[in-house]
Amino acid sequence: MRILGIDPGSRKCGYAIISHTSNKLSLITAGFINITTTRLQEQILDLIEALDCLLDRYEVHEVAIEDIFFAYNPKSVIKLAQFRGALSLKILERIGNFSEYTPLQVKKALTGNGKAAKEQVAFMVKRLLNITSEIKPLDISDAIAVAITHAQRLKLH
């Protein structure tokens, strides 16, 4: 089973596709979608086109998205919510459903501590998937962590 994990952001959207077979996890691909245009409509279109390319290239069975975190800048939250809405609609069209996890749930699933630092999550991602190279930026390790969290939840059910 292939799981797409997404860490949406207003400038970078981290993504990762992992394989979950026979209690074994392996990384298929990971990266980020760089949002460089300035107009909101173009940003949303670029994001959705990149997601379409990922879904066309890889046979994805499940999708997990990190939920919006609290932010002090209301404009950032609104923009992020618009991106998540566009992503959600595209995923519903292509896959049929998705799961959502809060940052606290992801951190707790990977480190056992819901208040863990991003670096601790990245360390556990590397350890669980036997990755020796550095994972940068942290949006990528966050997306991998979201996918791993979903794999763990599927295993429990």
UniProtKB/Swiss-Prot annotation:
Disulfide partners: none
Entry's cofactor comment: Binds 2 Mg(2+) ion per subunit.
Keyword Hydrolase attributed: yes
UniProt-recorded Gene Ontology molecular function terms: crossover junction DNA endonuclease activity; DNA binding; magnesium ion binding
Catalytic activity line of the entry: Endonucleolytic cleavage at a junction such as a reciprocal single-stranded crossover between two homologous DNA duplexes (Holliday junction)
NCBIfam families to which the protein is assigned, alphabetical: ruvC (TIGR00228)
Listed name of the protein: Crossover junction endodeoxyribonuclease RuvC
Originating species: Helicobacter pylori (strain P12)
Source lineage: Bacteria, Pseudomonadati, Campylobacterota, Epsilonproteobacteria, Campylobacterales
Annotated gene: ruvC
